[in-house]
Design a protein with these regions (language model features):
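Sec/Tat signal peptide C-region and signal peptidase I cleavage site
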Residues: 20-27
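Outer membrane beta-barrel
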Residues: 28-42, 53-177, 185-209
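Outer-envelope beta-barrel architecture signal
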Residues: 29-35, 71, 75-79, 113-117, ...
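Transmembrane beta-strands of outer-membrane beta-barrel pores
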Residues: 39-45, 85-89, 123-125, 174-178, ...
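Hydrophobic, lipid-facing positions within transmembrane beta-strands of outer-membrane proteins
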Residues: 61-65, 103-107, 154-158, 189-191, ...
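Detector for outer-membrane/organellar transmembrane beta-barrel domains
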Residues: 192-323
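Outer-membrane beta-barrel "beta-signal"
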Residues: 328-330, 362-376
Length: 376
C-alpha cells in the first residue's frame, strides 16, 4: 500500500491552499507503508533423530513490515529514510532479538551526482552485492557463514553508495564500535563493487567484523546478532565458549539473464579467528538456475558446496546441498511455493544441518515446505 502523509491525514488540499497563500514552494515528500507476510507447513526428515512436521514462518521469505520515505530537497537531492521490522507470523513475536526495527533503520541524503549517504542499522555489502545469488537459490550456505542471508546487520554504520557510472557502482561502509575503551572493540566495515551490462551483472564484496561478540561492548557494530544459534560457526570447535575475535568475508557473484532463464553463480571465502587462537577457513561455491515456464510459474534449481578446514584440530568438514522449488504466482502480490532442500555432510563433518532447523543425527537431512507469500 502506497500513500503519503498528507493524503493519510486528508490535508493535501488544505496544505496546498496555505502554500499558495503564503506564495512559498514546498518540497514534495512521500511515505510508503509496505510489508510481506509468509508462512506454511514443512516436513523435516531428521531433527535429532526424529522426523518432524512443523508450522513455519517465512517459508517463501522472511515476514516484515516497514516505512520508507523521501523528501525532495531540490537540485537532484532528497532526504531518505527506512524503518523495517521483522516478525514471526506463527506466534506474532518480533524478529532480530525483539528490536522495534531490527531489519533496517536508517536516514540519509541521496544525490543524483554524488550518490547516497545513510546512517543507522543497515545491511552490509555482502548482502547488497552477492546476497541476491543466495536468495535466488532458495537455500542458505551452512550456518549462513558468509552472511549471504543477512543474519548479521551493521549498526552504528555510515554507508555511501555511489551513482552508477559506465555500468560500475560501488559502496563503502563503516560501523563504529561506540566504545570508549577500544576503537576495534566490535567495529566493522565492508566494501562492494559491481558492474552491469545488458543482461549480465557481476559483483565483488568484502566485509570484516572485529570482536563481533564483545562481552564488554554489547552496543557495537554487530552486537547480539552474533549470538544467534543460526550462526553455527560463531564459536570455536575447540572451546565452544570462545567466540570469534574476527570474521572476514570475501565474496563474488552475479547473474546472466538468458531469455526466460536466470543463471547465477557465487564464490565466497570466509575466515574465522577465535578468541582461543584457533582458526576456521570456509569456502562456498553456488550455482543457481531459475526458469520462467510461464509468466506465473517459476522453477528453480541450485547446488551449493562448502569446504572447510580447522587448523588446531586438523579436520576438513564438507557439505553438499541441493535446493529445488516450484513457485506459482496467483497475482502480482501473492504466490505459493513448494520447496525441497537436501544436505549431505562429507569429509570430517559429523552431521547435516539445513539453515533454520535443528541438526540431523546423521550426515543427511531433507526438508520439504509448502508455503505462501503476500506483499503489500
Amino acid at each position: 500500500m502506497k500513500t503519503t502523509i498528507l493524503a493519510r491525514l486528508g490535508l493535501a488540499g488544505a496544505c496546498a491552499t496555505m502554500a499558495l497563500a503564503a506564495n512559498t514552494a514546498h518540497a514534495q515528500s512521500n511515505v510508503t507503508i509496505y510489508g510481506l507476510i509468509s508462512g506454511g507447513v514443512g516436513y523435516v526428515s531428521n531433527q535429532g533423530g526424529s522426523k518432524n512436521w512443523q508450522a513455519l514462518s517465512g517459508t517463501n521469505q522472511n515476514p516484515r513490515w516497514g516505512f520508507k520515505g523521501t523528501e525532495d530537497l531540490g537540485n537532484g537531492t532528497k532526504a531518505v529514510f527506512t524503518l523495517e521490522a521483522g516478525f514471526n507470523i506463527m506466534n506474532g513475536t518480533g524478529a532480530q532479538n525483539g528490536r522495534a526495527f531490527g531489519r533496517q533503520s536508517f536516514v540519509g541524503l541521496s544525490d543524483n551526482k554524488w550518490g547516497t549517504l545513510t546512517l543507522g542499522r543497515q545491511y552490509d555489502t555482502i548482502h547488497d552485492y552477492v546476497g541476491p545469488v543466495i536468495i535466488s537459490s532458495n537455500g542458505v550456505n551452512i550456518g549462513d557463514n558468509d552472511n549471504g542471508y543477512n543474519d548479521i546487520r551493521m549498526q552504528n554504520s555510515v554507508k555511501w553508495v555511489s551513482p552508477t557510472v559506465g555500468g560500475f557502482h560501488g559502496t563503502a561502509q563503516y560501523g563504529f564500535s561506540n566504545s570508549a575503551t577500544g576503537f576495534r572493540n566490535n567495529n566493522a566495515y565492508s566494501f562492494g563493487l559491481g558492474y552491469k551490462y545488458a543482461d549480465f551483472d557481476w559483483n565483488v564484496a568484502y566485509a570484516q567484523y572485529n570482536n563481533p561478540y564483545s562481552a564488554t561492548n554489547t552496543d557495537g557494530a554487530i552486537a547480539n546478532d552474533y549470538a544467534s544459534a543460526l550462526l553455527l560457526f560463531s564459536k570455536s570447535a575447540v572451546h565452544p565458549t570462545s567466540y570469534a575475535s574476527q570474521q572476514r568475508i570475501f565474496a563474488t557473484g552475479g547473474f546472466y539473464h538468458w531469455g526466460p532463464a536466470l543463471i547465477g553463480a557465487m564464490f565466497s571465502d570466509v575466515r574465522y579467528t577465535y578468541l582461543d587462537a584457533s582458526h576456521l577457513h570456509l569456502q562456498n561455491y553456488n550455482l543457481t538456475l531459475n526458469y520462467n515456464v510461464t509468466p506465473a510459474l517459476v522453477l528453480g534449481a541450485a547446488y551449493g558446496f562448502t569446504s572447510g578446514k580447522y587448523d588446531v584440530i586438523n579436520t576438513r568438514p564438507q557439505w553438499h546441498q541441493v535446493n529445488l522449488q516450484a513457485d506459482y504466482w496467483l497475482s502480482k502480490r501473492t504466490d505459493v511455493a513448494l520447496t525441497l532442500n537436501a544436505q549431505q555432510a562429507a569429509g570430517d563433518a559429523q552431521y547435516a544441518q539445513l539453515f533454520g532447523y535443528a541438526a540431523s543425527s546423521n550426515k543427511r537431512q531433507m526438508a520439504v515446505t509448502l508455503g505462501m507469500r503476500h506483499t503489500f
